[in-house]
Amino acid sequence: MPFLALELKCQLKGITDLRPDDTDSFHWHMKLKCTNCGEAPDHWQYVVLNEMLDVPGSRGEANLVEKCKLCGRVNTLTIVEDMFKSYNIEQNEKWQQIAVFDCRGLEPFDFDPRDEWIAKSVETGNAFHEIDLSEKEWVDFDDKAMEAVEISEMSSQFTTIRDPKKK
């Protein structure tokens, strides 16, 4: 079972603990490649933790079940619960794991952070909701700290990891 971790790297200024606002209903928008034939459609697909589909010919379920249009293979992707992490300012501008996916026959190769995110002020702990990262940057003002807060230079990558549930 290949597990792929979504890692982000960005520059935070004045905020920390950047994460999806609601991991249960967050839409993880990705571009996916079939690992059997290499078909990589240039369109975005999304998976949601609280949306499960039956896997044909199996007793299993997955967050995404897709039949490859080129080779016909049925592929699945499942979000690994309880593996969500926040992007933290202590490791600013370094790759940090945000989520983990169990990929069978699919390999994510691009991520679009277009759904709502949340973060908090480093100085005051003030929460910032509904952060829109569709442009991969965001700027606001922390009224309590009287300073600008921002997210910039966001990039993403997927890395193969061992089974995240095993110690």
Swiss-Prot record:
GO molecular function: zinc ion binding
InterPro entries for this protein: CXXC_Zn-binding_euk (IPR008584)
Residues binding Zn(2+): 34, 37, 68, 71
Keywords, alphabetical: Metal-binding, Zinc
Domain of life the protein comes from: Eukaryota
Record remark on domains: Requires a bound zinc ion for normal folding and solubility.
Protein name: UPF0587 protein F46B6.12
Organism: Caenorhabditis elegans
